[in-house]
């Protein structure tokens, strides 16, 4: 009886080892991609998700908190990034040139994408899970569907400065649930670095800049026992320490779930 139990245990253990070893090996993430823009192309793997010609998520959102990423200025040219690209939300809004030369459907011509979401699949040191639209944009003319059928491809990328049309300014969305004691804001359409590492708030008549805490994605928040009084000015710091000040951008009669456009943008 004991030998039978031992045999059974050995079989189960062998099955467990076999199950663990199945599938492609996990690849550790590479070093974080910073705002040091260079000409060198780096290797990555590319996949796509969502509808074949869509913007990625079914709700046109994603882990950065952006909304309507199918519309201008993103226009569906979006991607998830793995850890060294998404950087726990601090990579949200950053821009990359991406291209592929294989399979045959690839054009080898770079297109620009925005980081709007995250992925955690350990298939490469750098992994872009692009929208169906962005993935197809790397293809030769008329071969986008053929390229999407490839599924997983080797691709090249490099960080670039974000450039928005002249009428696009840094925009703030006051999140649902915000009130005088809790203020949460989504920051989007930041040119240059694209990503934000610090947000501060100054009340009308005050000289104090109060730091906000990163909530998730591109959303920042502040909790305060003393009610905040508008209008508010917001100061945004990008990864390369460029500071942008939007004076009185949030009016004194501000509302939750509302969009406020500034007059500022990175040159």
UniProtKB/Swiss-Prot annotation:
Q: Which domain of life is it from?
A: Eukaryota
Which PROSITE patterns does UniProt cross-reference here? EXPANSIN_CBD, EXPANSIN_EG45
The identity of this protein, by name, is Expansin-B10
Role this protein plays: May cause loosening and extension of plant cell walls by disrupting non-covalent bonding between cellulose microfibrils and matrix glucans. No enzymatic activity has been found. May be required for rapid internodal elongation in deepwater rice during submergence.
Q: Where in the cell is it found?
A: Secreted, Cell wall; Membrane
Cellular component (GO) terms are:
extracellular region; membrane
Report domain Expansin-like CBD positions.
181-262
Query: Which residues carry a glycan?
Result: 32, 213
Q: List the disulfide bonds.
A: 64-92, 95-162, 100-106
Please report the organism this UniProt entry assigns to the protein: Oryza sativa subsp. japonica
Pfam families found in the cross-reference section:
DPBB_1, Expansin_C
The Expansin-like EG45 domain is annotated at: 61-167
Q: Which UniProt keywords apply?
A: Cell wall, Cell wall biogenesis/degradation, Disulfide bond, Glycoprotein, Membrane, Secreted, Signal
How does the record say this protein sits in the membrane?
Peripheral membrane protein
* Protein family according to the UniProt entry: Belongs to the expansin family. Expansin B subfamily.
Q: Where are the transmembrane segments?
A: none
Secretion signal span: 1-22
